[in-house]
Amino acid sequence: MSGTLGIAIQPLRVADSNAEAVRLTEYWSARCEGRAMPARRDLDVVEMRDWLGRLSLYEVLGDGDMWCRLRGSTMCTIPVPGHDSDGVLVSRTQPHSFAEMGLRHYAETHALAEPTCYRIELSFDGLTYRYDRLALPLASDGVLRPMVMTFIKCDVRRARAFWERYQEAGLALTS
């Protein structure tokens, strides 16, 4: 058994991702209303119901870290070590290489002030799973910090099995 998490990352045009990511990006673009990006208050959760379970919100802290403000209900069923449903620093997610990959993607999205999308493949102990992660920047509204909203498209059953195997190997807190 290898104790190393393999991470392969491929930049992806949103149009080459999946129909749900395309529709969410169109929704986000419509909320810009002439600005570089919308703020969280510009988004209506009722209009976003098709995506809610796979959305997460990350607050930009300004020190290179992000605070997981909200993790979608579907995403909460995937046992990523150290990545609770909300109220956790992304840097505390395990393994560290996985946290760093997420932080780079979120920081890039915030800095570019435009949607970014990646196809990510994780491998460990002969098991792999692939997912697309769309990240959309959200401006500060003067009260809330700027945020990055993510949408994940994956095989949830496979993702659960992957992270469960990773944790069973006892690597969740040592990688």
Regions from the PLM with identified roles:
Residues 1-93, 97-175:
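Intrinsically disordered, low-complexity terminal regulatory regions
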